[in-house]
Swiss-Prot record:
<protein>
    <recommendedName>
        <fullName>Probable S-methyl-5'-thioinosine phosphorylase</fullName>
        <ecNumber>2.4.2.44</ecNumber>
    </recommendedName>
</protein>
<feature type="binding site">
    <location>
        <position position="176"/>
    </location>
    <ligand>
        <name>phosphate</name>
    </ligand>
</feature>
<dbReference type="InterPro" id="IPR000845">
    <property type="entry name" value="Nucleoside_phosphorylase_d"/>
</dbReference>
<dbReference type="GO" id="GO:0005829">
    <property type="term" value="C:cytosol"/>
</dbReference>
<dbReference type="Pfam" id="PF01048">
    <property type="entry name" value="PNP_UDP_1"/>
</dbReference>
<feature type="binding site">
    <location>
        <position position="175"/>
    </location>
    <ligand>
        <name>substrate</name>
    </ligand>
</feature>
<comment type="function">
    <text>Catalyzes the reversible phosphorylation of S-methyl-5'-thioinosine (MTI) to hypoxanthine and 5-methylthioribose-1-phosphate. Involved in the breakdown of S-methyl-5'-thioadenosine (MTA), a major by-product of polyamine biosynthesis. Catabolism of (MTA) occurs via deamination to MTI and phosphorolysis to hypoxanthine.</text>
</comment>
<feature type="binding site">
    <location>
        <position position="8"/>
    </location>
    <ligand>
        <name>phosphate</name>
    </ligand>
</feature>
<comment type="similarity">
    <text>Belongs to the PNP/MTAP phosphorylase family. MTAP subfamily.</text>
</comment>
<keyword id="KW-0808">Transferase</keyword>
<dbReference type="InterPro" id="IPR035994">
    <property type="entry name" value="Nucleoside_phosphorylase_sf"/>
</dbReference>
<feature type="site" description="Important for substrate specificity">
    <location>
        <position position="157"/>
    </location>
</feature>
<feature type="binding site">
    <location>
        <begin position="50"/>
        <end position="51"/>
    </location>
    <ligand>
        <name>phosphate</name>
    </ligand>
</feature>
<dbReference type="GO" id="GO:0017061">
    <property type="term" value="F:S-methyl-5-thioadenosine phosphorylase activity"/>
</dbReference>
<feature type="site" description="Important for substrate specificity">
    <location>
        <position position="211"/>
    </location>
</feature>
<keyword id="KW-0328">Glycosyltransferase</keyword>
<comment type="pathway">
    <text>Purine metabolism; purine nucleoside salvage.</text>
</comment>
């Protein structure tokens, strides 16, 4: 099953397939927003609105652990996340799409691991799944590669912070991409992001940053974003051939790998999916 974590502007994604069910899940970390499970191109897809349907959860208050855990419980093995971002480069402007290959984490107060009671050091040498990245960047006009900088929010960044991020090699800056990527890796799920640039970052932009421009760009480009995700779902194979699915090998100091996410073995069995493309 494929999971889609929808950010600003694409809450209609669930209407593009054949709806099977819809509802919230109770996890050890709390209740999730309403998740829609539907069929698209022969694949089962679970869509979860990151901020809740009314966009009433600010980035630093999103229950990232509950969202990722719930997707794992549903049997999701591959996650496509969408993120609205500001650009740190003049060559990448509002309306452009970026598929990052790495990240810088400047979040501070968010629960960022499932392993508070076990000593687990998951490898992040390749932070985003190569297979999903390839599927997303196959669409025309998508920038393949970049460094995603995640800040705590909910405020926008200062000019000094933006200069620091640029010096460190950042490409885009947002508030929602982490700890999602890490949590997915800790549960051995494939994860990649498609970022839509909504504005230039502070001091690069000639004007004051507002949330209005974020929503304006998302509204203008949401159909293109949905098309990119749709094409990626068509291209993604059910069989995994990437390191993501073995991320916990060698990660547990006490070598109790089989106990790290006890309870998923019966729930998350390999999915048998149709291989034909039957369209929305």
């Amino acid at each position: 099953m494929i999971g889609i974590i929808g950010g600003t502007g694409i809450y209609e994604m669930a209407e593009y397939g054949r709806l099977e069910r819809r509802g919230s899940l109770i996890t050890p970390y709390g209740k999730t927003p309403e998740i829609s499970v539907f069929k698209l191109h022969g694949r089962r897809v679970a869509f979860i609105p990151r901020h809740s349907p009314g966009h009433d959860k600010p980035p630093h208050m999103v229950n990232y652990r509950a969202n990722i855990w719930a997707l794992k419980e549903l049997g999701v093995r591959q996650i496509i996340a969408t993120n609205a971002v500001g650009s740190l480069k003049r060559s990448i402007g509002p309306g452009d799409f970026v598929v990052p290959h790495d990240f810088l984490d400047f979040t501070r107060s968010r629960p960022s691991t499932f392993y508070d009671e076990k000593t687990v050091h998951v490898d992040m040498t390749e932070p985003y799944c190569r297979n999903i990245r390839s599927a997303l960047s196959g669409s025309s006009g998508v920038v393949d590669g970049g460094v995603y900088v995640c800040t705590e929010g909910p405020r926008f960044e200062t000019p000094a912070e933006i200069r620091m991020f640029q010096t460190l090699g950042g490409t885009v800056v947002g508030m929602t991409g982490l700890p999602e990527a890490v949590l997915a890796r800790e549960l051995e799920m494939c994860y990649a992001s498609i970022c839509l640039v909504s504005n230039y970052a502070a001091s690069i932009s000639p004007s004051k940053l507002t949330i209005d421009e974020v929503f304006e760009i998302m509204d203008e480009k949401k159909n293109d974003l949905i098309d990119i995700i749709d094409a990626a779902i068509r291209d993604l194979k059910t069989e995994q051939s990437c390191p993501c699915q073995h991320a916990l090998r060698g990660a547990d100091v006490n070598n109790h790998e089989e106990e790290l996410y006890e309870g998923f073995n019966d729930i998350c069995k390999p999915e048998k999916e149709e291989q034909h493309h039957d369209g929305p």
